[in-house]
Amino acid sequence: MHQNTESVAATETLAEVPEHVLRGLPEEVRLFPSAVDKTRIGVWATKPILKGKKFGPFVGDKKKRSQVRNNVYMWEVYYPNLGWMCIDATDPEKGNWLRYVNWACSGEEQNLFPLEINRAIYYKTLKPIAPGEELLVWYNGEDNPEIAAAIEEERASARSKRSSPKSRRGKKKSHENKNKGIRTHPTQLKASELDSTFANMRGSAEGPKEEDERPLASAPEQPAPLPEVGNQDAVPQVAIPLPACEPQPEVDGKQEVTDCEVNDVEEEELEEEEELEEEEEEELGEDGVEEADMPNESSAKEPEIRCEEKPEDLLEEPQSMSNEAREDSPDVTPPPHTPRAREEANGDVLETFMFPCQHCERKFATKQGLERHMHIHISTINHAFKCKYCGKRFGTQINRRRHERRHETGLKRRPSMTLQSSEDPDDGKGENVTSKDESSPPQLGQDCLILNSEKTSQEVLNSSFVEENGEVKELHPCKYCKKVFGTHTNMRRHQRRVHERHLIPKGVRRKGGLLEEPQPPAEQAPPSQNVYVPSTEPEEEGETDDVYIMDISSNISENLNYYIDGKIQTNSSTSNCDVIEMESNSAHLYGIDCLLTPVTVEITQNIKSTQVSVTDDLLKDSPSSTNCESKKRRTASPPVLPKIKTETESDSTAPSCSLSLPLSISTAEVVSFHKEKGVYLSSKLKQLLQTQDKLTLPAGFSAAEIPKLGPVCASAPASMLPVTSSRFKRRTSSPPSSPQHSPALRDFGKPNDGKAAWTDTVLTSKKPKLESRSDSPAWSLSGRDERETGSPPCFDEYKISKEWAASSTFSSVCNQQPLDLSSGVKQKSEGTGKTPVPWESVLDLSVHKKPCDSEGKEFKENHLAQPAAKKKKPTTCMLQKVLLNEYNGVSLPTETTPEVTRSPSPCKSPDTQPDPELGPDSSCSVPTAESPPEVVGPSSPPLQTASLSSGQLPPLLTPTEPSSPPPCPPVLTVATPPPPLLPTVPLSHPSSDASPQQCPSPFSNTTAQSPLPILSPTVSPSPSPIPPVEPLMSAASPGPPTLSSSSSSSSSFPSSSCSSTSPSPPPLSAVSSVVSSGDNLEASLPAVTFKQEESESEGLKPKEEAPPAGGQSVVQETFSKNFICNVCESPFLSIKDLTKHLSVHAEEWPFKCEFCVQLFKVKTDLSEHRFLLHGVGNIFVCSVCKKEFAFLCNLQQHQRDLHPDEVCTHHEFESGTLRPQNFTDPSKANVEHMPSLPEEPLETSREEELNDSSEELYTTIKIMASGIKTKDPDVRLGLNQHYPSFKPPPFQYHHRNPMGIGVTATNFTTHNIPQTFTTAIRCTKCGKGVDNMPELHKHILACASASDKKRYTPKKNPVPLKQTVQPKNGVVVLDNSGKNAFRRMGQPKRLSFNVELGKMSPNKLKLSALKKKNQLVQKAILQKNRAAKQKADLRDTSEASSHICPYCDREFTYIGSLNKHAAFSCPKKPLSPSKRKVSHSSKKGGHASSSSSDRNSSCHPRRRTADTEIKMQSTQAPLGKTRARSTGPAQASLPSSSFRSRQNVKFAASVKSKKASSSSLRNSSPIRMAKITHVEGKKPKAVAKSHSAQLSSKSSRGLHVRVQKSKAVIQSKTALASKRRTDRFIVKSRERSGGPITRSLQLAAAADLSESRREDSSARHELKDFSYSLRLASRCGSSTASYITRQCRKVKAAAATPFQGPFLKE
């Protein structure tokens, strides 16, 4: 410590003492001139100070010894990561009052000794100090038995504490965190004197202690306690390791607050660090200690806090801290003493305890330990800190808090209970500080939130504690682990480090800081009292976002019950959701509780709910978070969370329409969200919710209900909605007029309704992240993070709902509607008229203004929905991605949010300031796509938004004007694709917003065209007075056709679910969107996505593209800008923005890479780049459709598949050839454009594109059906996409967008398989991954010529094709895919492909992919039904039976094992038709017939054989299903079948059949053995033969004959099954003879003769098999026999299939 020898240069005076030091002085001491050193100030006792009281921590700058100029005010502490560091308080401004404690000159004078706790130095009273005595410290405790005993006891207690694994982990974490430098002033400045002694300590006691303690994280600190003192001679022996028994209070860096404050800061930092550890370990104890320290912002005063609590108290207190402390303390013990103390610490505590305490049950190994312990029982005079839970008193605030945290941890574990620590202000301090704490730290609120939203408010109030000095300390509990922190910053740091990074796996990770949505202005400010409760929400926002998606509280059922009908009743009262109270529980953990938790929505328009969490800062500033309208919430708590008491921001929403800074979307936009939030939960979503942590849906919830909820969520802002939809696809979208969509319902929605809305949101928001909250333009734009922080948007929504009904309409539209990209424009005009059309209803963007109140209500509801939207992260996202094509889908969700944001901008249209960038003119297809992002930007500036609105219609729908090309609207549509959410979201609000705009109609039109097809109805609710029909009208025009852009998801969404539309919530999609600029949808989406992404990471950074920088910049700030210009390094939210920006460099950098949007000055550099990085060499252009291919094989395959009847030639461009998309300035492209191709009608190419995309869509669907997740990352972005350089996949890599715009990353990847780091390049056929494009292309050639068994897209290949199918008529083919996706989710759905077929008819392809898909799907459905029946039969007969080999009677646990055994290794197996033959027949024949039975039954030859064997075996028991039929679980198999069918249609490759079979087998594996009998296996072979027969009439006839013969034999032996044969065969007979001529078909045809021969031989084999089966059947019994007969009949049916196929096709 400071010794006289090293006196300060100048004499210290009381006048020089910093104010914070005086504030931090404990009441027992005062500063006066020192008696031991006349030049210094000393600390004098004014009241009796009992022995054992602790003061600290010592605060100062953390420096290396070499940096310390004065040893007097320094303590040296050992940090595990930093080594020895000095806590230097030479600068009074950096220290606290402990720096004024002088060195004792003798042991008699000494009354304090240093302790090191958690690498912080504390002073502990060695003996009672009488008033008038000066506090003098020395650190040579070895000579003083009392000090030695105290240190020893400290060590012992520390040992016992650290013995617990939790404390160990916590200490380790704390050490790590502390090492990071979080605490810079833990130790006192007396280092100078301690320095020399410290050296001793290090040598003797400290060294060993360090070793002991380090594991505990406090050990490293212990050595520090002994500073090397300036006069080493004077203090060398004094080196006393500070006992670490007490966890050092985190030192706050805020000395100004007081030493306590400083301590708090430090503590908070430490706590943050520790929290990471503790939270990870769930070590509340340790956390508690640190938290306690943190909460003690009075830690500053806490330095003076007497740490009377003994190590045991510490033990009682949070273990982690005490553990660390103990470890540290032993080390800190006097250096000489340390070794011995250490030994004792290691042994005594563990040894017998000889000295029991007479007051409690504790026993001590040493008398000294007991004596030290006794201070706990000393008169409560010195124990002013009483536990509010149990009344136990503590000498220090830190100890008390540490202890209380233990209670709170327990409470935290009981979700039903509120955080009592916060609720219980037993400590007067706690109560006093309540408001302060509430406002400042969201952590406490979070904890409360976790426990109970309602309680949270109380807790928050109580969460603050009064410090010793009487200051109110705010407690900031972690919403995840309930750990309490002294400051919001610490709590947030803890959450980010400990929880949020872990949330990522849950799909809830926030990308970068969540954009804090500007909270609606002061309207919600009233609750702005700095009550932590609101903070809790915001705090939770960021994490909650992550969480909600993961976990839906059990309260969901409750909430759903309110919103189950899909409508959230909203009324003016609802619009002002003062408080949405939710129970916190697991849902809370995920932040979902807010969404799902019993939404006891006490909604009063004035309430500032915890949703204030819209922005953590906001929350801090105003717990109500209403005041923080403009603030961006770092994390938005799920605004819709019922538990959270959220004040409806509706009122303020209107005023703060511009408030949503992130999106710069007018509050109106938020309002629109507020309208009604319906969350459509697809079965998948439900599953996710259920599987998520504690996301079990209440019994009340049913699958059906969830979908209903989904719609409610849909009401949520489009951004949210898109997310949700992308995350979870709703199998069925609620009817446009469904209650959820009905505006009336919305209007009527009450706070209770709000609760329901919350539930919906939660359901939808499996990934409820702020995405759901996208209601607020800002948050929407801000991106996922914002979305994730759903709460703030909630506020925004509320505020907006109140004041900006119109504005909200816009935002609602954006958020809610899955943007109908293709028909967006068209629908714009139609928008108002058709409520009935589901897609239209989604897009209902009618400019209905409903009363602000209703709007506010709806806004609230929207907010509720938003969290659900946020949920997009879960698996639904995968489906959506697949449907929208990985890229499209991905960007879609993200884009959706941005779009929503844009939409809100228009909503803000009341400002009617034209958006510079988003002028109607910019509504070019590509520009349009970009515009939306810009719109987002404008969103921030209300005026711009308005302008955008009028000029570009809906920023959301389409930055472009209603007249803007449909592509743009489609893009927007894509952005809003989360139809499920959208439907519920009141688009009307956006409409209303639009109405203020100069182009309300256009806006509504835009909206209609925009994504909210489903949402539209919801939107209409937004103008609740207006029936959903109006919203539908808005959306009506877009209709399914509108979805064309978002084709995959959009079109699917009506039937599948909006989620299908939003399938691409993945943020990365932005790039893909841009790339697919050619695709209207894609082009548009990319822009949106970029914005979101950029917003997320960058948040407010305005895009260059979006001059409406105000809002846009806000949004961008929230999102990280993932796209960087390689010339000026400017970051952009989206490739679109980047692409727009590139024109700035067009002069100097005329060339650009279309894949990664990098600029090049020299053409050769570009060529080299494209070749080396993207594998693009010569480009081959199809003469028919002008599609570009990087590889000739792809072009040829394309021509074979799409132009089979046309004379196809191709143009080859040298690798250096530049195309328009390679020019930074497209205008120059015309001059230098590569050799122009002969102009041919684009119609053909368009049709072919459709077909191709249809096939790709099928592939995508298949992939989805197989349950494969597509990777979020969009590989197409190359440089700007965080992925390895993109190499064009084997599809139409170089497909140029019709507009020629946005060719950049999408061209090559339009049909790309999404590449991720793990699977950068994958064969779409067999799923094999390759390292580079050349390898891929080689493989593709081999794979294509290989057995047809390798399907076009591997079932498990998460490769959604990028291209969205966009029929000319605007109908999106993706609709079916969406349905399929849903089916895959487990709820088989009857798909109606009428639209698709209609589309295809224009193409007039012989076998349109759509037709095939339709037929296949129908077949699959029929099969599925039959399979279900058969399955039941199987269960009855053979389910119980084990898998027995029919040949050798060997039993197998798994059917797969049996199959393998039967196929390859059964020694007794009779020779079955050669596998090769079988495979060939199945391969070729199967493709030709593409009958579902063949598909299912014909897998790999091996499989088929195995199945045959199995069937033979099963013949023993009646096999309910044939292999094809037995597609195991009907649902799973059904999708597989349909996918297979499509595949067969595309490529008559038995590969598909094989896949289908395997999938079906897999699906039905439990029953499969029973289902698949020999007969069945044979039948598939026969079927395969029949397929090949299809290829050649000869073959078919021969096969038919053979089949008939075999059938006759079987019939003679098994007449019982005659009745069933016909029915079962019918399904299989639905085989199409026609189909696109694929390589497989050609191969099959070529091999016709050989096939015939093979078939003959295989037929013979099959007959043998049949006879064998019959024999088995005769043995097994009639049931089996009948089954065999059925099988035979199936074979016959298969043979007949070729004839029936055409009929089915027609």
Swiss-Prot record:
Chain residue ranges for the region called Disordered: 154-342, 400-446, 492-542, 618-655, 724-794, 823-1075, 1088-1112, 1218-1251, 1466-1563
Modification sites for Phosphoserine: 416, 637, 738, 776, 780, 791
SMART domains: SET, ZnF_C2H2
InterPro entries xrefs: PRDM2 (IPR009170), PRDM2_PR-SET (IPR044414), SET_dom (IPR001214), SET_dom_sf (IPR046341), Zinc_finger (IPR050331), Znf_C2H2_sf (IPR036236), Znf_C2H2_type (IPR013087)
Cross-link (Glycyl lysine isopeptide (Lys-Gly) (interchain with G-Cter in SUMO2)), chain numbering: 645, 684, 686, 769, 860, 870, 1136, 1140, 1269
Annotated Low complexity bias: 733-743, 1010-1019, 1034-1062, 1487-1498, 1548-1563
Enzyme Commission identifier(s): 2.1.1.355
Biased composition (Pro residues): 962-983, 1020-1030
Stated name of the protein: PR domain zinc finger protein 2
Organism from which the protein derives: Rattus norvegicus (Rat)
